[in-house]
Amino acid sequence: MATTFSLPPLPYAYDALEPVICKQIMEIHHQKHHQTYITNLNAALSAQSTALAANNIPQLINLQQKIKFNGGGHINHSLFWKNLAPHASPETNIDQAAPVLKAAIEAQYGSVEKFKEAFGATLLGLQGSGWGWLVANGPGGKLEIVSTKDQDPVTDKVPVFGVDMWEHAYYLQYFNNKASYVEGIWKVLNWRTAEDRFKNGVEGSALLKL
């Protein structure tokens, strides 16, 4: 029997990220979009189990893209919710919440502001749908800004934090003004979660836990 996944609860209320991300976006994004990825992932895994039992290799191959896309959507969104925290909460203060990560950012990018500029340029440079990520390259902790297409997840590095650049993440509130969404996301970024992921990655003990 195939493993099934369920929608994780948000670690805050749907209106907790206002005014940066409105309640309506959070409700639709979590209850509809994320749930759809999980529903489709479970269906694909069930079909995979059936195909495996029948030794149906062509069907197993056909299901790979569905599992990758919907599984990636589940991974990415599960990480994204934990990347966020209510505006002006202690978690959004990098000095208090992420001193180790802040020092690494400053050492590599010169300053937090220069890093934000570089990260923002990557987000706004995405064509179509995708994600922007700050990742750590395992032990040693070298930081890197990367983007992934559609729902491709980060699997070969430690995802410190990511930002959803699909239109469903911002369009109801920001319309086509992606720059304002990107500017606002820093106000609700959970630096404490980012710090934990970064430190675990440096120590070589990071596991992708949803």
Swiss-Prot record:
Keywords: Antioxidant, Manganese, Metal-binding, Mitochondrion, Oxidoreductase, Transit peptide. It is an enzyme of class 1 (oxidoreductase). Mn(2+) binds at H29, H77, D164, H168. Pfam families: Sod_Fe_C, Sod_Fe_N. Its EC number is 1.15.1.1. It is found in: Mitochondrion matrix. Binds 1 Mn(2+) ion per subunit. Belongs to the iron/manganese superoxide dismutase family. Destroys superoxide anion radicals which are normally produced within the cells and which are toxic to biological systems. Homotetramer. This is Superoxide dismutase [Mn], mitochondrial. It comes from Aspergillus oryzae (strain ATCC 42149 / RIB 40). The gene is sodB.
